[in-house]
């Protein structure tokens, strides 16, 4: 390892590796700490993320975008309410090649790992090293965040997310599907290309229902899933394992700070700083936007400023908290709205969905916000005097 390290990043997941590559290409010397160890490979990794156009452009710039078979374009999206309220989006109406891309996590992690391996300014470590700036990208259960004494404000949802992969009897046609029902929120995310017959499933239900679904035999689970989706893609067959995790809305009260008497500053990014309900499909997009903003501000700083300069880090915190707020509020509002079972509320929300689906300009604007959020800060460099 070089004698001097500029930035130590704890957490070598997608967000941490992306930050390491962004900084390293600007000549910043990075120690990337991966304390998790290599995956066992005993079970197939079923994780998939919906990435927007901003995230794709970022990863393509780093030459880390997965091959086509691992990044399926979402050409259409169908959202069905629990009593006749439907909303439809399509990429053509939004004048875009895709609304989003569903990316296999193992494929993306492999591309990032390869890029890190051949980046001379990044060294992969098993333990943390001293550096002027520590960036925490350890996820929602970050131990380092707790050690720093940062309060993580958590509001649990009365739901657990269940994830699975299933083979479908009919091609998905590049359509992402989402159902809101009395039982919860079910999403089918297309995989394997526009004519593929595999989907990633995310089913948000009550914890006891999630446990019951986990205990079903694969054929029975697939049958239950097909019924919940109204047979939209024909007969379903479970592929591999299922997994669950509790849902929560969370945000750290502080995203940066200084360690007294050490000359070291710290910052949080990704799920270590915030989490939202998965119904938005924006979790990883928000984390990638965090590190893109942090890297931009660090590399745009005046030469006389250290990477540990608190003015730079506070600017990052202000920008990202402001950018996060619209998605945080809208996602939480939808989650709370569809969790209510009163007949009047149910009728009102479905009426609202039907009306929304008829307003073409509004639908196109919403689709554009999902693909290219207007509240993302312009990535153009800024001068050192802008830090205050």
How would you name each of these model-derived features?
Residues 296-388:
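C-terminal helical "tail/cap" subdomain of flavin- and related membrane-associated enzymes
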Residues 11-16, 139, 270, 283:
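Conserved phosphate-binding and hydrolysis motifs of nucleotide-dependent enzymes
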Residues 209-308:
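FAD/FMN-dependent oxidoreductases across multiple families
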Residues 2-3, 57-61, 70-147, 153-160:
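Conserved N-terminal helical subregion
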Residues 59, 136-244, 251, 256:
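Conserved FAD-binding catalytic core of PHBH/FMO-like flavoproteins
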Residues 7, 30, 132-134, 267:
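Hydrophobic "anchor" residues on beta-strands that sit immediately upstream
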Residues 4-8, 12-75:
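Glycine-rich FAD cofactor-binding loop and adjacent beta-loop-alpha segment at the N-terminus
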């Amino acid at each position: 390892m070089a004698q001097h390290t500029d930035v130590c990043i704890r957490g070598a997941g997608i967000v941490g590796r992306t930050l390491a590559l962004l900084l390293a290409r600007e000549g910043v010397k990075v120690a990337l700490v991966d304390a998790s160890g290599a995956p066992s490979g005993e079970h197939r990794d079923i994780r998939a993320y919906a990435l927007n156009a901003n995230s794709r452009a970022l990863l393509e710039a780093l030459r880390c975008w997965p091959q086509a078979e691992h990044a399926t374009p979402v050409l259409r999206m169908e959202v069905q309410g629990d009593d006749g309220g439907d909303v439809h989006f399509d990429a053509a109406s939004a004048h875009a090649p895709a609304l989003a891309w569903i990316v296999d996590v193992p494929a993306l992690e492999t591309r990032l790992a390869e890029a890190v391996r051949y980046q001379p300014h990044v060294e992969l470590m098993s333990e943390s090293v001293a550096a002027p700036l520590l960036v925490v990208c350890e996820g929602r259960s970050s131990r380092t965040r707790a050690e720093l004494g940062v309060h993580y404000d958590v509001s649990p949802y009365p739901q657990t997310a269940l994830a699975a992969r299933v083979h479908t009897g009919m091609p998905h046609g590049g359509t992402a599907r989402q159902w809101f029902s009395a039982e919860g929120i079910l999403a089918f995310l297309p995989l394997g290309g526009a004519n593929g017959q595999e989907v990633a499933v995310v089913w948000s239900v009550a914890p006891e229902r999630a446990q019951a679904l986990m205990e079903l035999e694969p054929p029975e689970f697939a049958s239950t899933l097909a019924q919940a989706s109204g047979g939209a893609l024909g007969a379903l067959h479970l592929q591999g394992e299922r997994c669950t995790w509790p849902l929560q809305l969370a945000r750290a009260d502080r995203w940066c700070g200084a360690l007294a008497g050490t000359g070291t500053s710290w910052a949080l990014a990704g799920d270590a700083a915030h989490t939202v309900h998965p119904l938005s499909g924006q979790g990883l997009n928000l984390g990638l936007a965090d590190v893109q903003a942090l890297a931009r501000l660090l590399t745009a700083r005046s030469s006389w400023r250290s990477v540990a300069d608190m003015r730079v880090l506070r600017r990052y915190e202000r920008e990202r908290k402001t950018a996060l707020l619209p998605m945080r509020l809208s996602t939480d509002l939808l989650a709370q709205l569809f969790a209510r079972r009163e007949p009047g509320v149910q009728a009102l929300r479905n009426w609202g969905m039907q009306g929304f689906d008829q307003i073409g300009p509004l639908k196109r604007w919403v689709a554009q916000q999902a693909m290219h959020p207007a509240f993302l800060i312009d990535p153009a460099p800024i001068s050192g005097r802008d830090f205050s």
